[in-house]
């Protein structure tokens, strides 16, 4: 068969796919039906390629790096859960691939190679990490460009890690990839957790990817379903939720993680159709949503998608969201020591307001906003953290 016969290539794209204590045995035995259910497994079995974000190093050693945030890992035996979803492609451009250092990522890459599992998005250096993945079948070529925001795991010219999003390189990389493919899909690992809309800057980045030739841009990492924007010649999905990531850390975020989206892509030489398949979290993994559940999920999704058609809404919603988070960021400037916490309690949790005034807020804004101060401040902090 060749493309002239009208072949339709079908892909399913899921987001974060992580074994945890509750379902680890199912991964190790490759019992994928117990993880995803019979109906969902049927969809994957009919797919030309199943794409997921491998949000965890697969390693038996414990070599955690210094970072702010959780160091995830999963035993190498859990590889069988992924292998059971062949044909599979795993993306590694995320904020956890280097959680257990060079050792953990090296073990992961070697394990994927041993089990003949396609992957991209991380490597020995940025040159290796930025290499796209091209999937071709029946004359249809789809290129995947994978990148992650800077959060302790990105590669450099000389160090191992994930492909970093870079405003000087990433858009040009997508433009070059499009010249060799029929279609380009960008998987951008970024955006703020548990926020269902794009920030103004994230929206600009994603639109720029489309301007450079991307047919589909999916923002992963937010752990919740966001909103969709059909922009220019492409589609942007600002958050699709987890695929399987049954973490106790989500105990206070059940409303966000209860449902997710699979993104279905049906491509021919002449068309590229994108649709959403709602799924629901279960105790052990995930399953296809019922008709009523799917209606509930998609109705809310479509409402949010209507909201972001208004540029003012995108700006105002993000301003309001920032108001709920800024104190958390500022607390780091006064420290976490027991003495500080005790004094803060003594002053009715208002120590920050007493220590930081208008001048301090303006200075912090300048240090973060001005390119020269931002670069110098960040370099200095990194130097301190390496001592």
Regions found by a protein language model. Give the residues of each.
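Catalytic alpha-helical scaffold of carbohydrate-active enzymes acting on polysaccharides/glycoconjugates
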Residues: 3-4, 13, 19, 23, ...
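Active-site-proximal beta-strand elements of phosphoester/diester hydrolases
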Residues: 10-16, 141-149, 185-187, 237-240, ...
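Active-site neighborhood of phospho(di)ester-bond hydrolases with catalytic His/Asp-centered motifs
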Residues: 13-15, 50-55, 87-95, 118-123, ...
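Active-site-proximal segments of metal-dependent phosphoesterases and phosphodiesterases across multiple
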Residues: 61-83, 183-215
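Conserved beta-sheet core of the metallophosphoesterase superfamily
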Residues: 86-89, 200-261
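A short C-terminal boundary segment appended to hydrolase-like catalytic domains
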Residues: 254-255, 259-387
């Amino acid at each position: 068969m060749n493309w002239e016969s009208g072949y339709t290539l079908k892909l399913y794209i899921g987001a974060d796919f992580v074994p945890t204590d509750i379902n680890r045995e199912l991964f190790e035995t490759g019992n994928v039906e117990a993880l995803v259910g019979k109906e969902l497994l049927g969809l994957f079995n009919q797919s030309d390629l199943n794409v997921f974000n491998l949000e965890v190093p697969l390693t038996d050693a414990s070599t955690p790096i210094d970072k702010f945030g959780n160091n995830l890992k999963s035993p190498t035996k859990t590889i069988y859960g992924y292998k059971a979803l062949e044909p599979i492609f795993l993306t590694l451009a995320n904020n956890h691939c280097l959680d257990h250092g060079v050792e953990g990522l090296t073990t992961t890459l070697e394990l994927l190679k041993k089990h003949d599992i396609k992957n991209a998005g991380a490597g020995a250096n940025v040159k290796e990490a930025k290499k796209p993945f091209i999937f071709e079948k029946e004359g249809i070529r789809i290129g995947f460009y994978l990148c992650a925001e800077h959060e302790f795991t990105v590669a450099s010219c000389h160090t191992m890690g994930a492909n970093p999003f870079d405003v000087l390189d990433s858009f040009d990389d997508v433009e070059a990839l499009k010249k060799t493919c029929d279609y380009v899909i960008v998987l951008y690992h970024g955006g703020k957790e548990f926020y269902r809309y794009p920030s103004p800057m994230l929206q600009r980045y994603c639109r720029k990817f489309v301007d450079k030739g991307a047919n589909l841009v999916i923002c992963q990492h937010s752990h919740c379903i966001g909103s969709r924007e059909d922009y220019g010649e492409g589609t942007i999905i600002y958050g699709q939720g987890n695929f399987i990531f049954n973490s106790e850390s989500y105990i206070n975020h059940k409303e966000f993680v209860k449902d997710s989206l699979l993104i279905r892509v049906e491509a021919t030489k002449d068309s590229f159709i994108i649709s959403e398949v709602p799924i629901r979290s279960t105790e052990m993994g995930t399953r296809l949503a019922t008709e009523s559940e799917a209606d509930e999920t998609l109705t809310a999704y479509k409402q949010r998608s209507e909201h972001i058609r208004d540029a003012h809404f995108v700006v105002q919603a993000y301003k309001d969201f920032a108001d709920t988070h800024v104190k958390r960021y500022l607390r780091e400037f006064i420290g976490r020591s027991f003495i500080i916490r005790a004094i803060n309690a003594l002053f009715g949790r208002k120590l920050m307001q007493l220590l930081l005034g208008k001048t301090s807020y303006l200075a912090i804004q300048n240090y973060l906003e001005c390119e020269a101060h931002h670069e110098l401040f960040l370099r200095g902090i990194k130097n301190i953290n390496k001592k």
